[in-house]
Amino acid sequence: MVSSIKDMLKYDEGEKLEMYKDTEGYYTIGIGHLITRIKERNAAILSLEEKIGHKVKMDSKNEPIITSSESEALFEKDLSVATKSIESNPTLSTIYKNLDNIRKMAIINMVFQMGVNNVLTFKMSLKLIEEKKWAEAAKEMKNSTWNHQTPNRSNRVISVIETGTLNAYK
């Protein structure tokens, strides 16, 4: 059952302890942790080793792997970065501060996935969210590249915005 932002993100991101390429071709690991924007495998491994503080272990297929605790540490840092980036952005922080805790989770989820700058491109949706016009905001969000690229996840997040509940995560 999803009851926290951590649960929500783990549900949406999943957790993979081996390095993989995300839908954009970037090396990722753990709970949606983007290792680097460099698409070269060795550069990703070096960056990962720097982040975890030691030489990475390899699995039987010679793929880099991390432990659950390393995954959790990367996740905690990423979650902190997402939250701080919301709080430090004048536009988003104003909207975010006036939301209930459930809808705040939806905004954090979007920023975790796309980053603040991409979330800020949802100008009309954010205006409608600020005005607490939930159904209109949801309709606007459904008409987005984000919704077409990751429909399952985005529809869950949009439902959270629209209903103020976590029912989409049951």
UniProtKB/Swiss-Prot annotation:
Known EC number: 3.2.1.17
The signal peptide stretch is: none
One Gene Ontology BP term is:
killing of cells of another organism
* Single Gene Ontology MF annotation: lysozyme activity
For this protein, the record's InterPro entries field holds: Glyco_hydro_24 (IPR002196), Lysozyme-like_dom_sf (IPR023346), Lysozyme_dom_sf (IPR023347), Phage_lysozyme-like (IPR052619), T4-type_lysozyme (IPR001165)
Q: Which UniProt keywords apply?
A: Antimicrobial, Bacteriolytic enzyme, Glycosidase, Hydrolase
| Domain of life from the UniProt record | Eukaryota
Positions annotated as active site in the UniProt record:
13, 22
- A Pfam family hit: Phage_lysozyme
The UniProt catalytic activity note for this protein reads:
Hydrolysis of (1->4)-beta-linkages between N-acetylmuramic acid and N-acetyl-D-glucosamine residues in a peptidoglycan and between N-acetyl-D-glucosamine residues in chitodextrins
The record's family statement is:
Belongs to the glycosyl hydrolase 24 family.
The protein here is known as: Probable T4-type lysozyme 1
Q: Which organism is it from?
A: Dictyostelium discoideum
